[in-house]
Design a protein with these regions (language model features):
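The feature marks proteins involved in alpha-glucan
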Residues: 2-39, 66-69, 76-170, 179-186
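Structural beta-strand segments of beta-rich domains
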Residues: 40-44
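Conserved, mostly hydrophobic/aromatic
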Residues: 46, 98, 173, 202, ...
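Short proline/glycine-enriched turn/loop motifs at strand-loop junctions of beta-rich domains
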Residues: 47-53
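Beta-strand signatures of extracellular beta-sandwich domains
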Residues: 55-57
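A conserved hydrophobic secondary-structure block that centers on an alpha-helix together
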Residues: 174-211
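Aromatic- and acidic-residue-enriched carbohydrate-binding clefts of CAZyme catalytic domains
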Residues: 184-191, 222-259
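Carboxylate/His-rich catalytic cores and anion/metal-binding grooves
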Residues: 202-230
Length: 259
């Protein structure tokens, strides 16, 4: 199969083969990652070593209970990959997650639980975040879902600067920490926009490259604790989930999780 564009129209003429929970489906794109929008629906692909079954959960935006559960037919499972194209979905009308079934054997490192709700590790947007530093209610359960996002940003005439490695002057920084304090003098402290407003300052210093600490979605309450009376958070964002979803708490505008 060809490489992915911003919208996949391959297979447009291929008809649905099955109906699951009221949705027409057919095998999806096995060499893709995550959710890929097409002209007629969305292909959902997930890879898991050891999984024996997979269910796609569909949620209406901001709702905690799924309105549809689509169990992948056995024929849609090849090797370690589950792939299913669901027809008729509009990407701004739903959120999604997965459930995986399989063996539970600690000695083999297999910890499957078919009741666990799982994020798509290749999600381009994640919903369910709280205000920074707020703990979830104890009865909330799993509140994080994924959104499908079009890769349609117009780069215009922008090109990569191609600065030789020996000429790089790299400034490493944290998006939130760099401009969070009012002394930074920006209008959108602690955000990508605040960082953008500081580019002239960095250039005046002679900096020609910025290296950012993690900017993907992460849970700042992971390992949160109080030490010597001070509340500590996972400030840096080093974890192993949602590498492809920008952190919406670093956005200066309304995003998926702030609707």
């Amino acid at each position: 199969m060809a490489g992915l564009g911003h919208r996949q129209d391959r297979g447009v003429m291929l008809p649905p083969l099955d109906e699951i929970d009221g949705f027409m489906v057919r095998p999806g794109f096995y060499n893709s990652e995550g959710a890929v929008p097409t002209a007629r629906g969305v292909s959902f692909t997930i890879h898991s070593v050891g999984a024996t079954g997979c269910t796609l959960l569909l949620f209406r935006p901001q709702e905690k209970e799924p309105y549809a559960r689509l169990k992948y037919p056995e024929a849609y499972h090849i090797g370690n990959t589950f792939a299913m194209l669901v027809f008729g979905l509009k990407i701004d009308e739903f959120e999604y997650a997965f459930q995986l079934d399989g063996p539970y054997d600690v000695s083999r490192g297999l910890l499957f639980d078919k009741n666990n709700v799982l994020l798509d590790p290749f999600a381009k947007a994640v919903t369910g975040q709280r205000n920074w530093g707020e703990r979830p209610e104890s009865d909330e359960g799993f509140v994080y879902h994924a959104r499908v996002v079009e890769n349609n940003f117009d780069w215009g005439k922008m090109t990569f600067p191609e600065i030789p490695a020996e000429d790089l002057i790299i400034y490493e920084t944290h998006v939130r920490g760099f401009t969070r304090d009012a002394s930074s003098g920006v209008t959108a402290g602690g955000t990508f926009e605040g960082l953008r407003q500081k580019i002239p300052y960095l250039k005046d210093l002679g900096v020609n490259a910025i290296e950012l600490l993690p900017i993907f979605e992460f849970d700042e309450m992971e390992s949160a604790r109080v030490v010597d009376g001070v509340q500590l958070y996972n400030y840096w964002g080093y974890n192993t989930v949602s590498f492809f979803a920008p952190n919406t708490s670093y956005s200066s505008v309304v995003e998926h999780n702030h609707e």
